[in-house]
Amino acid sequence: MIPISRLRPGRLHKKSDPTSNWLIIFLVWAAGLGAAAQFGKIAVSLDEFRTIYSVGEVGLGFLISCVGLVGLVFGVAGGILIPLIGIRRAFVWGMFGAAMLSALQAVHLQYFALIVLRILEGASHLLIVVAGPILMARHSSVAARGAVMTLWSSFFGLSYMLVALIAPALLTLGGTSALFVAHAGYMCVLGVALWRVLPPPVVTDSAQRTKKPLDLATILRLHVTIYTSPWLSAAALGFVFYTGLYIALLTYLPDFVDTVQRTGLSASLPLASIVTSLTLGVVMLRFIDPVRAVIIGYVLIAVSAVPLIFTLGQDAVFIVACLVLLGATGIVPGASFALLASLNADETDRAYATGAIAQLGNLGTTTGPPILAAIIAQFGLSGTVAFVMLFSACGISIHLFLAGRRSKTMNQRD
């Protein structure tokens, strides 16, 4: 079995605090925008694909979700394999793989062939989203790390917004081929830039202890080890409730306002989350630890959901209430990614924890929307508020439970 370091809290590791390399940080973050666009480029092109493929809405939806299924199934495996490959190498491979696959998708293929390429693209996506936050933490100072990880957490929502703004012109210019070629070029250019600026890896004890043959039994045992560890699992077990909430609310809240208002609300909701994340979220992490920040975030989400009940039917006020609610969600993702570094000082452990967050993050995005859809069908808006409060309570409870386990373990060592 692969051993995992037991002294994870950062205060137990006396290391010099390097200055932040902002060039690398912003390039890695820009690469994250491109990784999120692997979903967004299909989402904004569904009308085009309806004219190309006669597969129904479920089949079209699978063009989007099949990329996430790779992370759902192989998230932890990615966290195991990436340290073996090398963090830098895995990230650059992911970028070039994404560029190549996006270029191949620019050719009008049969539906099944496109699905195969999308699944392979999911593997490149996994390499990027697991290695990315590790590189961000590696090249940031301890003082700046909370802000840096919050910046990383914004990549998904911001990318969707940017793709929605840029894609229409590209689709008008040359259809999906133009959009996919542009995405391929973006990933290739960034891949070259990162290959040039990322320093070569330094072999550490952490890397040496993972240089062991892997088999299915070892991978399954490591799944158990990760999800029973209060350090390795904390970020992922708290994050899954956020992703379930966030995507579900983005999908269904606009349905509660007049049709004329829906497009504007759909575009504004992720922006509210991003603004809060990059302002209040960053400030909070300067003064309180990430676990408390996540808990505060979930409390604010639960409280912010209540006004929805009293403002339904008053679209202007209801829209403000929706923006406040989505703004409250912006605290949780940055604090959750900051947990990866604060609870796991060892880079191999960070890779394992990041693999878990990729796995459970995809679980949340996959299950949250259909759960909320079923609740709305039976209970309407009141069910939506109950859904938000339940998921928030689960996020708070799991973090309190895991914090208690970590405290008990540390007291036993003392």
Per-segment meaning from a language model:
Residues 342-381:
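A late C-terminal transmembrane helix in Major Facilitator Superfamily
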Residues 42-43, 231-275:
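Extracytoplasmic gate region of multi-pass secondary transporters
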Residues 291-336:
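C-terminal transmembrane helical hairpin of 12-TM major facilitator-type secondary transporters
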Residues 74-86, 277-290:
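Helix-to-loop junctions at the C-terminal end of transmembrane segments
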Residues 73-109:
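Conserved MFS/SLC helix-loop-helix module at the cytosolic interface between two early adjacent transmembrane helices
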Residues 142, 150-199:
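Helix-loop-helix hairpin linking two adjacent transmembrane segments in secondary transporters
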Residues 8-18, 199-234:
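Juxtamembrane intracellular "pre-TM" segments in multi-pass secondary transporters
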Residues 117-156:
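Cytoplasmic helix-loop-helix junction between adjacent transmembrane helices
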